[in-house]
Amino acid sequence: YFTVGERMYLHTTAAGKAILAEYPEERVDFIVDRTGLPGQTDRTITSREALKRELDEIRQRGYALNRGEDQEGVYAIGQVATKPSGAVLGAISVAGPTYRTKKRRFEERLTSTLDGHIGKLEARLQ
């Protein structure tokens, strides 16, 4: 579970990685220089090279995944919301316990749901 207002590392969450994937490499480097890439679990990305590969995959796929990288046993999918200019508004993610999620089905069902909600959010905030 998470507490409202709790701060989390961007590289460990689906929403955070979705946001990082929208940023230029220089901004990602700046963030990593300030926060580092601390491991939260044994699945957390802790190297710049691995993070760069993950962000490239997110850009191609259109959504980010968290495979127990922030908390053991939690699987999440996240997408970013942007302004027409391309500026990041934020991100939305949906998470569930690993034991209750069939990963492929989880992704297939939730990407269209997230797409719809992201579209509504972007339309309302423009």
Language-model segments: what does each one mean?
Residues Y1-D70:
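Short, solvent-exposed recognition segments
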Residues F30, G36, D115-Q126:
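Cysteine/selenocysteine-centered motifs that mediate thiol-based redox chemistry or coordinate metal-sulfur cofactors
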Residues S47-K120:
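Extended hydrophobic
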